[in-house]
Amino acid sequence: MAYHYENLKLEKGMYSQSGRSFAQTLEALDPSENYKGTSLEGLDAFQRQLKRFDIKVKGAGSDRVEKFFWSTESAVLFPEFVSRVVRQGMEEESILPDITATVTNFDGMDYRSIASTPTEEEKKLKRVEEGAQIPQTTIHTQENLVRLHKRGRMLVAPYEAIRFQRLDLFAVTLRQIGAYMGRMHLEDAVKVLKDGDGNNNAAKVYEV
């Protein structure tokens, strides 16, 4: 049986689709739902492309870095591989999700949030008698914009230095980079919890 993923045309321009990541672009061209009930169920579009080019990225039998560059199309997959492994390092053992209410993705350098700031009395859900007015909770936009700070790391390595390295070993370094980035994100989050985001919402200070 022929599958669509085997004939998909991979190009570098797939990374520059407006409002879409490379993985989302791949998924749109080769939806995972089409593989339900097949041996490929459970793989996403990127993982199917790894299978297409027979690139093994984990375990004792993992391939060398150079295998990504055996063709121009398989080379297109390398940045996504790096991105995924770095993200894995950011998320491993991270407590950031435990102190984050929600995640918002957007394009821009600053962000205006919304908030509800009820008093202690307004937080109480009191009994409402028949015909009486129901108490209201007000949601409003924050007065000040939250300015975002860009963080990043450029990975520089001569091809000769990494081409013969196994992908699972190369991934260790990438996960370390991700862990460092995750630590910085956590520090940023704790600072906002402590000092606020510029909207007069710093944490209360208690003296013991």
Which stretches of residues belong to each language-model region?
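Charged/polar, solvent-exposed surface patches and flexible loops
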Residues: Q24, R48, R52, K67, ...
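Intrinsically disordered, low-complexity terminal tails
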Residues: M1-E73
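Alpha-helical scaffold segments that mediate packing/assembly in large oligomeric complexes
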Residues: R153-V208
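Assembly/oligomerization interface modules of large self-assembling protein complexes
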Residues: V65-R151
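Polar low-complexity intrinsically disordered regions enriched in Ser/Thr and small residues
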Residues: F22, A45, Y111, I134, ...
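Hydrophobic transmembrane signal anchors and adjacent membrane-proximal interface regions, especially
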Residues: L8, R48, I55-V57, K67, ...
